[in-house]
Amino acid sequence: MLCPSCRCEDSRVVDSRVVEGGIAIRRRRECLQCLTRFTTMERSVLLVTKRNGVTEEFSREKVIKGVKQACQGRDVSDDDLKLLAHEVEQSVRADYGSQVNAHDIGLAILPPLRRLDEVAYLRFASVYKSFSSSEDFEAEIALLRRQHQGNAPSSGS
């Protein structure tokens, strides 16, 4: 690591911590030449393979941008979207390792978005799952209702 003060390449690690839910490592370093302390963040690269075969780095910003359109006019904050993108990244890393198909990212977005806002979920799902009729919406709404009934507290008799 280059020291930001003197550009020396020699430094020692003073402290290391896992951050961002295990996605990154924060290292506190000290330059061996000028003794300046500085912080570095190390993150493993998550590669996304798109439909056309092109591979690029995972982008939380792209997740946020895609979901933000579905959340337009809804009571969803930027912090909510950042949290969702973080959750999607963690889920994808846990399930697929260091490389994932773009389609699988879309699938990973659906559960946390459904928990965040069901209307935004339906909007996103309608595009992602290529809804072509009102019946597609009705089927998805029926699925949501069944899930609500399955999660409803039972009346203890």
UniProtKB/Swiss-Prot annotation:
A zinc finger (unnamed) spans 3-34. One of its GO terms (molecular function) is zinc ion binding. PROSITE patterns: ATP_CONE. It holds the Pfam family Zn_ribbon_NrdR. Residues 46-136 form the ATP-cone domain. GO terms for biological process: negative regulation of DNA-templated transcription. Binds 1 zinc ion. Its cofactor is Zn(2+). Negatively regulates transcription of bacterial ribonucleotide reductase nrd genes and operons by binding to NrdR-boxes. HAMAP family: NrdR. Belongs to the NrdR family. This is Transcriptional repressor NrdR. It comes from Corynebacterium urealyticum (strain ATCC 43042 / DSM 7109).
